[in-house]
From Swiss-Prot:
The channel permeability is down-regulated at acidic pH. The gene is Cldn2. It is a multi-pass membrane protein. This is Claudin-2. The disulfide bond is necessary for pore formation, but is not required for correct protein trafficking. InterPro entries: Claudin, Claudin2, Claudin_CS, PMP22/EMP/MP20/Claudin. The record marks D65 as: Paracellular cation selectivity. Expressed in the kidney, liver and intestine, with higher levels in the ileum than in the jejunum. Low levels in the brain. Expressed in colonic epithelium (at protein level). Expressed in the perivenous regions, bile ducts, and gallbladder epithelium (at protein level). Forms paracellular channels: polymerizes in tight junction strands with cation- and water-selective channels through the strands, conveying epithelial permeability in a process known as paracellular tight junction permeability. In intestinal epithelium, allows for sodium and water fluxes from the peritoneal side to the lumen of the intestine to regulate nutrient absorption and clear enteric pathogens as part of mucosal immune response. In kidney, allows passive sodium and calcium reabsorption across proximal tubules from the lumen back to the bloodstream. The chain crosses the membrane at residues 8-28, 82-102, 117-137, 163-183. PROSITE patterns: CLAUDIN.
Length: 230
């Protein structure tokens, strides 16, 4: 039988992973302006996300513009959008499925069926974590490649934004949650314990009354025959 505490820990991590992935997907600071070289003194700082880009002035005013078209964006941005949306959908579905398979709920009272449902929820968490980790790692690689490339001008270089750190942590939470839910159930162990108890109980109840009744019957018969002839 799966441990209730382990399942709760896995489910909470999955919820945190879903929340972090959704926030990281919407944040506009996947890439932030790099203040190196000639661009160390500038009046405007830029940040780019999956859905919008923002400009922060030296006065503290920030202006954000949503991308006017999605089809005109670079291929890596489009792929990141699709994978992050799919990751959030997978994690949301995993949260719903895992609720049915957890021991603290009243759904699906059969313990074996609950274990199977919990494993399915864990698999969806793992898929959501993988889909959320790929675009984050992809953008992280592109930022580091352009930053250390001598062919890219200093004004075109960006640094790692806070959204990427949040995306990495959220993806790891989803992966760990899926692994916990998948390995917290052991159907084979439950099956062996169930059959062992079922076979041992009838043998104990049937053998003990017979052994106790046979000597008693012999003693009654012997006493009856002796008193009758005397």
């Amino acid at each position: 039988m799966a441990s209730l505490g382990v399942q709760l820990v896995g489910y909470i991590l999955g919820l945190l992973g879903l929340l972090g992935t959704s926030i990281a997907m919407l944040l506009p600071n996947w890439r932030t302006s790099s203040y190196v070289g000639a661009s160390i003194v500038t009046a405007v700082g830029f940040s780019k996300g999956l859905w919008m880009e923002c400009a922060t002035h030296s006065t503290g005013i920030t202006q954000c513009d949503i991308y006017s078209t999605l089809l005109g964006l670079p291929a890596d941005i489009q792929a990141a959008q699709a994978m992050m949306v799919t990751s959030s959908a997978m994690s949301s579905l995993a949260c719903i499925i895992s609720v049915v398979g957890m021991r603290c709920t009243v759904f699906c009272q059969d313990s074996r069926a609950k274990d199977r449902v919990a494993v399915v929820g864990g698999v969806f968490f793992i898929l959501g974590g993988i889909l959320g980790f790929i675009p984050v790692a992809w953008n992280l690689h592109g930022i580091l490649r352009d930053f250390y490339s001598p062919l890219v001008p200093d004004s075109m270089k960006f640094e790692i934004g806070e959204a990427l750190y949040l995306g990495i942590i959220s993806a790891l939470f989803s992966l760990v949650a899926g692994v916990i839910l998948c390995f917290s159930c052991s159907p084979q162990g439950n099956r062996t314990n169930y059959y062992d108890g079922y076979q041992a109980q009838p043998l104990a109840t049937r053998s003990s009354p017979r052994s106790a009744q046979q000597p008693k019957a012999k003693s009654e018969f012997n006493s009856y025959s002796l008193t009758g002839y005397v």
